[in-house]
Amino acid sequence: MGSSKSKPKDPSQRRRSLEPPDSTHHGGFPASQTPNKTAAPDTHRTPSRSFGTVATEPKLFGGFNTSDTVTSPQRAGALAGGVTTFVALYDYESRTETDLSFKKGERLQIVNNTEGDWWLAHSLTTGQTGYIPSNYVAPSDSIQAEEWYFGKITRRESERLLLNPENPRGTFLVRESETTKGAYCLSVSDFDNAKGLNVKHYKIRKLDSGGFYITSRTQFSSLQQLVAYYSKHADGLCHRLTNVCPTSKPQTQGLAKDAWEIPRESLRLEVKLGQGCFGEVWMGTWNGTTRVAIKTLKPGTMSPEAFLQEAQVMKKLRHEKLVQLYAVVSEEPIYIVTEYMSKGSLLDFLKGEMGKYLRLPQLVDMAAQIASGMAYVERMNYVHRDLRAANILVGENLVCKVADFGLARLIEDNEYTARQGAKFPIKWTAPEAALYGRFTIKSDVWSFGILLTELTTKGRVPYPGMVNREVLDQVERGYRMPCPPECPESLHDLMCQCWRKDPEERPTFEYLQAFLEDYLGILAWTPWEDKQEGPRGETASNKQERPGEDTLAADES
């Protein structure tokens, strides 16, 4: 595994210097033509929430319901009403004969959006017609179509994106406020000797007349004009806006239209990534076009009928911190096709070369991401049953996603179902689940506490020196693992809350996510790849003074 610097080497990542039009405005202005959203100060932080896909009734074009949610986690936002012409946010290469290839910026007429996540569209550029992923487009001339608009991402996620050391000062994005519906926030990367890389968040307020402003002395009729102005003038910001924050293409919802139960021949197994008691994991390609991960299960591991029934539920779980289930081969040997995560399992990542460079802020951030995914599982009334570092996958920029949720329930191996054999993860399992088979979201919380020890010890096996039977006996008598070396007591206290004997006294994942994100906020953020210099070689000796720095109040809460 190489460095986690995220250089945009391919067209799937978007970075560009901003060259705005001359649209400076001062004083009052008429209302913007962008969707009317009531902006309010982003005054304080609240625990972040998941943004899974909202199910809606199918509808023919003629109009959009403004309560719809764009499924891309980094381009979320309400679709504009009455719009049938959309613009492409990313390049897309067709994967099947019925798909439509298109380029970023291409305008598309939507013909039919009643068939789920893949819409029938007609390109106004090429004249061709085919199916497109709905989260790759946005209504033409809307704020959702702006490259700098990231919609409904959390404050923490915006910081994760902006704190990439490759980003120069002034890299920015505009997002929805977490605290006030319809409000916006401008998030800007900065650098100084005291804090190193950091992010400033500025409230974007709304005028009664419909305009927008950060400071009342400089007002704009639209967010586009506000961004254009501050790309030329810092005017009280920490730095003028320079580059739009780079981001990768989102995952499509499924491989293609109607690609769920797929033929085994459509998959090519290329690189073996790992092997476990019940099968193997491969990097591979679907249909000769799409990189995927493929989990192959040994015959007899689980009933194909039970698996297919469970998979129908699993594919409906959609969250940016869950590994997306793409497709299945439902006849034995069962194949499970998911999105590919480039850095492999969290356990291998922690124990590998990159693990030694991880500091407490990165570890807490990874834990918060996992808690975010599990908070969604909690809200959906689902249970993972096998939460541990081996079942968390890592991507670029230390993105973590929960994998293999729900599969443990289906395993039919006698040694596993007895819950005592070597194949069963006793050390991660809550006592009521290990002894009596009572698996609930609260037993997942117990497992999360064990996972926290894996993070803080860089992948050490829990309960070192103890065998499974001894662990079960000792835990039943009240033993809990002591605080790992170099782990703050406050984090160990959180682990102990997860290990309370009464499941109902354990915290929720919603609480765990909020605690970890708030805890991360009080840590001095150490950027991935610890550097002594600022972005793009800016050091204390060559850093120039920034006139008017921080004359506008950034929301640091």
Curated annotation (Swiss-Prot):
Please provide the record's keywords in A-Z order.
ATP-binding, Kinase, Lipoprotein, Myristate, Nucleotide-binding, Oncogene, Phosphoprotein, SH2 domain, SH3 domain, Transferase, Tyrosine-protein kinase
Q: Which domain of life is it from?
A: Viruses
On modification after translation, the UniProt record reads:
The phosphorylated form is termed pp60v-src.
Regions of biased composition (Basic and acidic residues) lie at 7-25
- Mark the transmembrane ranges: none
Organism name? Avian sarcoma virus (strain S2)
Name the Gene Ontology molecular function terms of this record: ATP binding; non-membrane spanning protein tyrosine kinase activity
Write down what this protein is called. Answer: Tyrosine-protein kinase transforming protein Src
Enumerate the PROSITE patterns for this protein: PROTEIN_KINASE_ATP, PROTEIN_KINASE_DOM, PROTEIN_KINASE_TYR, SH2, SH3
- Positions contributing to ATP binding: L273, G274, Q275, G276, C277, F278, G279, E280, V281, K295
Q: Give the Pfam families listed for this entry.
A: PK_Tyr_Ser-Thr, SH2, SH3_1
Where is each Protein kinase domain found? 267-520
PANTHER family, alphabetized:
TYROSINE-PROTEIN KINASE
The reply to whether Coiled coil figures as a keyword in the UniProt entry is no
Q: Give all residue intervals belonging to the SH2 domain.
A: 148-245
Catalytic residues per the record? D386 (proton acceptor)
What is the primary gene name for this protein? V-SRC
Region Disordered, annotated ranges: 1-58, 530-557
List, for all copies, the residue spans of the domain called SH3: 81-142
E.C. code? 2.7.10.2
Q: Where is the lipid attached (N-myristoyl glycine)?
A: G2
Class of this enzyme: transferase
Give the record's family classification. Answer: Belongs to the protein kinase superfamily. Tyr protein kinase family. SRC subfamily.
Stored InterPro entries: Kinase-like_dom_sf, Non-receptor_tyrosine_kinases, Prot_kinase_dom, Protein_kinase_ATP_BS, Ser-Thr/Tyr_kinase_cat_dom, SH2, SH2_dom_sf, SH3-like_dom_sf
Record function comment: This phosphoprotein, required for both the initiation and the maintenance of neoplastic transformation, is a protein kinase that catalyzes the phosphorylation of tyrosine residues in vitro.
Q: What reaction does this enzyme carry out catalytically?
A: L-tyrosyl-[protein] + ATP = O-phospho-L-tyrosyl-[protein] + ADP + H(+)
The record's SUPFAM superfamilies line, in alphabetical order, gives: Protein kinase-like (PK-like) (SSF56112), SH2 domain (SSF55550), SH3-domain (SSF50044)
- Identify residues that carry Phosphotyrosine: Y416
